[in-house]
Amino acid sequence: MSAVPLRILCIHGYRQNGNSFREKTGALRKLLKKQVELVFISAPHQVPAIQEENCGTNQQSQTVSVGDEDQRGWWFSDVQARSFNAKQDCESSLGLEESIEAVKAALKDLGPFSGILGFSQGAALVAMLCALQEQKLEPDFNFRFAILVAGFRSACLEHQRFYEGPVITIPSLHVFGQDDRVIPEEMSRDLLPAFDGAQVLLHPGGHFVPAASSHRQTYQDFLKRFQ
């Protein structure tokens, strides 16, 4: 008797959107098609077309394709330029609260969901959402698990409140690459202490969602706990 697929809300990376992230995770959907149903949403903020960004040059080459005309972001670290750099220290950001509201709306309109998956800036947002759930600040959040691919701690000062509360007890799988030039491995490792019992899937590649057959068992063993 086959188990009912777990519904997972998927949060894309900076300069992506729900449709482009769905295309980029085709291998993962194929790998886990009997276990999960992935549902994709887009961030509320359109990213201005900018020729060069400090972290955007590498990130664009790694994660943005021709199909990403409608580039989106969950928040901006540079308020005036409306741009984002994961390595940029800043006191305040722009757009995070609207993005949290967008996730809440998706839960009401598209839910329920068993878990949540995020990539890059989306994974950083997932960590914040999990912190809000742990602190019981958002009654709409009831994620049973989280998968964070190329996640990181936000360098924005006003976001440190998400990491200063109680340790997050939501079961989590943290996936990151040894050759990631956009979000280096150490940035993803810095996020691990925020989660209790964080599980790690380390792959030899770069800035993408890995879905090789060698990764199947790790994903399946993690998800099996919730079916």
Swiss-Prot record:
Entry annotation: catalytic residues: S120 (charge relay system), D180 (charge relay system), H207 (charge relay system)
UniProt catalytic activity: a carboxylic ester + H2O = an alcohol + a carboxylate + H(+)
Gene3D superfamilies: alpha/beta hydrolase
Matches recorded under InterPro entries: AB_hydrolase_fold (IPR029058), FSH-like_dom (IPR005645), LovG (IPR050593)
Annotated EC: 3.1.1.1
Single GO MF descriptor: hydrolase activity
Keywords: Hydrolase, Serine esterase
PANTHER family associated with the record: ESTERASE OVCA2
Primary role: Exhibits ester hydrolase activity with a strong preference for long-chain alkyl ester substrates and high selectivity against a variety of short, branched, and substituted esters. Is able to hydrolyze ester bonds within a wide range of p-nitrophenyl derivatives (C2-C14) in vitro, with a strong preference toward substrates of >8 carbons.
Family as reported in the entry's similarity comment: Belongs to the LovG family.
Protein name from the UniProt record: Esterase OVCA2
Native species: Danio rerio
Lineage summary: Eukaryota, Metazoa, Chordata, Craniata, Vertebrata
Gene: ovca2
